Amino acid sequence: MFDQLVLASNNAGKLKEFGALFAELGVTVRPQRDFDVPECPEPHHTFLENALEKARHASRLTGLPALADDSGICVEALGGAPGVFSARFAGEPKSDARNNALLVEKLQGEANRRAWYYCVLVLVRHADDPQPLVADGIWLGEVRDEAAGEGGFGYDPHFHLPGYGVSVAELDAAEKNRVSHRGQALAALMAKLKALA
């Protein structure tokens, strides 16, 4: 087992969440900015390919094991869109407000509001790792026209959880981290790592 890895992201929230869990295994997680690793392009049409590209990129430039994720919202009535384009659905520069407005606009008159958040995590032990560790999670919900809640980010105010009766933005942060698509993927990845330790 390695004692440190690079997170192929500069997101402070992800660093904190991943850092706490990997600390249980004696692994220090460092953001790619610590190594001056530039953002990796995401040219692919699947979450898995993008996450693998980011992990290999960070590992290649640092010489360390690397962890990357890719995630987004998929809407059944839109054929799975915005999917891998979730962050830039309404174009550049990225804007949660514009992305949400476009999503609601595209669903006008559509009865089927079924959607899911998807996350895949990829861990490579080295840049050319032939057998990366992969874990994913899916969180089912539905898109609502009206935003609800102040928490979260991205599509959370419009992503309603029928089982909870609230939007993701209204959910307690600790509960969200436990049951979300990212939480599910992280739990699955940690189980795989512990089995290898």
Swiss-Prot record:
<feature type="binding site">
    <location>
        <begin position="153"/>
        <end position="156"/>
    </location>
    <ligand>
        <name>substrate</name>
    </ligand>
</feature>
<comment type="similarity">
    <text>Belongs to the HAM1 NTPase family.</text>
</comment>
<dbReference type="InterPro" id="IPR002637">
    <property type="entry name" value="RdgB/HAM1"/>
</dbReference>
<feature type="binding site">
    <location>
        <position position="70"/>
    </location>
    <ligand>
        <name>Mg(2+)</name>
    </ligand>
</feature>
<dbReference type="GO" id="GO:0000166">
    <property type="term" value="F:nucleotide binding"/>
</dbReference>
<feature type="binding site">
    <location>
        <begin position="9"/>
        <end position="14"/>
    </location>
    <ligand>
        <name>substrate</name>
    </ligand>
</feature>
<keyword id="KW-0378">Hydrolase</keyword>
<keyword id="KW-0546">Nucleotide metabolism</keyword>
<dbReference type="GO" id="GO:0036222">
    <property type="term" value="F:XTP diphosphatase activity"/>
</dbReference>
<keyword id="KW-0547">Nucleotide-binding</keyword>
<comment type="function">
    <text>Pyrophosphatase that catalyzes the hydrolysis of nucleoside triphosphates to their monophosphate derivatives, with a high preference for the non-canonical purine nucleotides XTP (xanthosine triphosphate), dITP (deoxyinosine triphosphate) and ITP. Seems to function as a house-cleaning enzyme that removes non-canonical purine nucleotides from the nucleotide pool, thus preventing their incorporation into DNA/RNA and avoiding chromosomal lesions.</text>
</comment>
<protein>
    <recommendedName>
        <fullName>dITP/XTP pyrophosphatase</fullName>
        <ecNumber>3.6.1.66</ecNumber>
    </recommendedName>
</protein>
<dbReference type="InterPro" id="IPR029001">
    <property type="entry name" value="ITPase-like_fam"/>
</dbReference>
<dbReference type="GO" id="GO:0036220">
    <property type="term" value="F:ITP diphosphatase activity"/>
</dbReference>
<dbReference type="InterPro" id="IPR020922">
    <property type="entry name" value="dITP/XTP_pyrophosphatase"/>
</dbReference>
<dbReference type="Pfam" id="PF01725">
    <property type="entry name" value="Ham1p_like"/>
</dbReference>
<feature type="binding site">
    <location>
        <begin position="181"/>
        <end position="182"/>
    </location>
    <ligand>
        <name>substrate</name>
    </ligand>
</feature>
<feature type="binding site">
    <location>
        <position position="176"/>
    </location>
    <ligand>
        <name>substrate</name>
    </ligand>
</feature>
<dbReference type="GO" id="GO:0005829">
    <property type="term" value="C:cytosol"/>
</dbReference>
<dbReference type="GO" id="GO:0009117">
    <property type="term" value="P:nucleotide metabolic process"/>
</dbReference>
<keyword id="KW-0460">Magnesium</keyword>
<dbReference type="GO" id="GO:0009146">
    <property type="term" value="P:purine nucleoside triphosphate catabolic process"/>
</dbReference>
<dbReference type="GO" id="GO:0017111">
    <property type="term" value="F:ribonucleoside triphosphate phosphatase activity"/>
</dbReference>
<comment type="subunit">
    <text>Homodimer.</text>
</comment>
<feature type="active site" description="Proton acceptor">
    <location>
        <position position="70"/>
    </location>
</feature>
<dbReference type="GO" id="GO:0035870">
    <property type="term" value="F:dITP diphosphatase activity"/>
</dbReference>
<dbReference type="GO" id="GO:0046872">
    <property type="term" value="F:metal ion binding"/>
</dbReference>
<feature type="binding site">
    <location>
        <position position="71"/>
    </location>
    <ligand>
        <name>substrate</name>
    </ligand>
</feature>
<keyword id="KW-0479">Metal-binding</keyword>
